[in-house]
Amino acid sequence: MTRPRHAGAFVPVCAALLLAAAAQPPRLEPPPQTPIRGLTEAPLLARAYDLVYDADFAGADAELKRACGPAPAQACDVIGAAAQWWRIYFDLDNRSADQAFTARLNTVIAAGERWAAREPERAEAWFYLGAAYGVRVQYHGQRLEFLAAARDGKRIKISMEKALSLDPGLDDANAGLGLYQYYADVAPSVLKVLRWFLGLPGGDRVQGLAQLRRASESGVLLKAEAAYQLHLVNLWYENRIGEAIQMLSDLHARYPHNPIFLLNAAQAHEVYRSDRAAALAIYMELVNGARGGSLREPLLAEMWGHLGAAVQLTALAEPDRAADEARAVIARRPSAPYGAVAQAQLELGRALDALGSRDEAVAAYRAALGAVPAGDPRDTGRAARQGLSHTPDRINTEATRLSIEGWRTFERGDAAGALAPLERAVQLRPDDGVHRYRRGRVCLAMQDRARARADFERALQVRPLPPAPFVAASYYELGGIYEASSDRTRALSMYDAAARAHGASAKTRSLAQRALARLR
């Protein structure tokens, strides 16, 4: 399973916000009688921010140049810093741009402090100051710099509260405050004990969610950012996986050139739904989109796709295809994502081990160790050493090799030639549901329905069960066998099980649904 990129981005920020409140906040002066409300030239700035979210960084820079002048310079500087953060966020393991980024952001924050001091009655001055601190909190949180994040968390809360006190209709400010309210309430128990010990103000989960939703629906600048953070909340704490995936789909529809929404959707299917078939489909969409020119940051997108696909294919009993995906990365020797070659060599070793090619697998593990980048943020070295120290069971790997050989022969249209290697695979590992399913498909193609039915039934009885797509496909094929024998009741039962099976491939689910519609 690939480790989710960017996962936990706001967990350390949550801790930071709670710790920040330990310091006594300065007493806010009452707002002036004539506060200055609104965001100057908001449509121009929103256009630039939309380009950032669509990963069009050059376009965003050009749009900011047009917007600045009519729009406040500080607003443009904050959005420019956010764009630079997104560039880093795309490849978080790479720290080479950190120093330049923090220097730029510190300058932006200092300018924001001066603006708020000059015009304390202007809501947008406080808003952009809080937004600048928000960018830096994300950076500190990702780098596990908790004390620095805590200091900035306090400043975000103060700045956004000040902005809302001056302009209650400034919905964008609800994004930052909503995150504070939510995480202060749902924080892990250790943080709640700390909050009680220090006398920190508590949060309100319901209010926090409402503020995040308000910002995601009515915000001008931070609408997309609020939606992105809300999808993380839904994944991590609310257990609204489907809603989170739908939010990513909506973001991808709005910003179709940004590959990160596809990446995050693939990871959500993989990690939170254990739906490797759906994850694989999206990883391949990344590859195809990068090659076809529909995605920006094409190198990153394609490598994310190949690496993710390799992991899924090994888990889905197709290690030969997994090896091909890993080799596609190795052949490119990409500069990004950070450590991609080491990860690809590791996945190649795992795929080759599954196929029984131990010597080649050992070479791949050693190549992974040689390619591990500074800091080894993905812990690839440890995984490669484990691969070197563990020799797979030879009977298992031989059965897998034969099963793949037979299945690829069948895919080429040679059912008769596929049968012998699959027979041998089942003989070696009779309780492997993958081998049973594959032999069942060959028997069905050869009109031997009795043997096919026995294999599909056995694939559903073995423990552990085969990967989910094989379970769903076995139900579907049994439905076809029962339908052919005019057993409508059992056919409906099997088709229904196939359509409902968790982790079924999109093709199997569609075929089962069509069969149900036909029989009903």
PLM ranges: what are they?
Residues 226-236, 270, 303, 307-315, ...:
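Alpha-helical adaptor scaffolds
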Residues 46, 79, 86, 128, ...:
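"A position-specific structural signal for the A-helix of alpha-solenoid helical repeats
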Residues 157, 200-210, 284-288, 353, ...:
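TPR/TPR-like (Sel1-like) alpha-helical repeat modules
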Residues 87-99, 138-139, 184-192, 237-242, ...:
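Alpha-helical linker/edge segments of TPR/alpha-solenoid repeat scaffolds
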Residues 26-47, 51-64, 70, 80-169, ...:
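Short coil/linker segments at helix-helix boundaries
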Residues 68-69, 110, 158, 210, ...:
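Amphipathic alpha-helical segments of tetratricopeptide repeats
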Residues 51, 84, 91, 133, ...:
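Residue at a conserved register position within TPR or TPR-like alpha-solenoid repeats
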